[in-house]
């Protein structure tokens, strides 16, 4: 297994640096050939969404589609796919950031009854308490 940093996924999605995008694609080809999984940590997904939103200006729909494609590709492995898929569904439907919904999923798994936040965009969202 090989763990990926955020910048590798950014290059694969955006192709904003052709040299690095080609190197990232070669890594995928090698991983497929060698039947090696590519691990994507939760924080990498959060950083990826941030970059795609803030730097690339992609829409929520486009970002959700990119994450969905990543989750459906057998080559990529994530920590807890069910939590990530629930967070992704909430991101598609809600107003918060993907990271907010992933935090909520991890908090629920840890037994927390709510997530305290100052983020006003989460007002009215289930299991968030805006302070």
Which residue ranges define each predicted feature?
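Glycine/small-residue-rich phosphate/adenosyl-binding loop
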Residues: 57-71, 75
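Active-site neighborhoods of divalent-metal-dependent phosphate/nucleic-acid chemistry enzymes
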Residues: 74-114
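Histidine- and aromatic-rich ligand-binding microenvironments
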Residues: 5, 40-41, 96-97, 119-120, ...
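Acidic, PIN/NYN-like endoribonuclease modules and their adjacent C-terminal/linker elements
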Residues: 1, 104-131
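Short, well-structured N-terminal submotif of metal-dependent ribonuclease cores
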Residues: 1-40, 55-62
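A generic structural signal for short hydrophobic patches within well-formed alpha-helices
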Residues: 9, 45, 122-123
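Structured helix-beta-strand junction loops
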Residues: 34-35, 73, 94, 125
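Amphipathic alpha-helical segments within well-ordered protein domains
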Residues: 49-53, 88
């Amino acid at each position: 297994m090989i763990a990926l940093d955020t910048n590798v996924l950014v290059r694969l999605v955006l192709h904003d640096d052709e040299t690095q995008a080609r190197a990232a694609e070669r890594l995928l080809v090698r991983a497929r050939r060698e039947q090696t999984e590519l691990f994507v940590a939760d924080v990498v997904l959060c950083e990826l969404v941030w970059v795609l939103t803030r730097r690339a200006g992609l829409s929520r729909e486009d970002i959700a589609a990119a994450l969905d494609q990543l989750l459906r590709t057998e080559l990529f492995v994530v920590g807890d796919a069910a939590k990530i898929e629930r967070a992704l569904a909430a991101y598609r439907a809600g107003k918060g950031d993907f990271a907010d919904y992933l935090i909520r999923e991890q908090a629920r798994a840890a037994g927390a009854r709510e997530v305290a936040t100052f983020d006003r965009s989460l007002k009215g969202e289930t299991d968030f308490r805006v302070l």
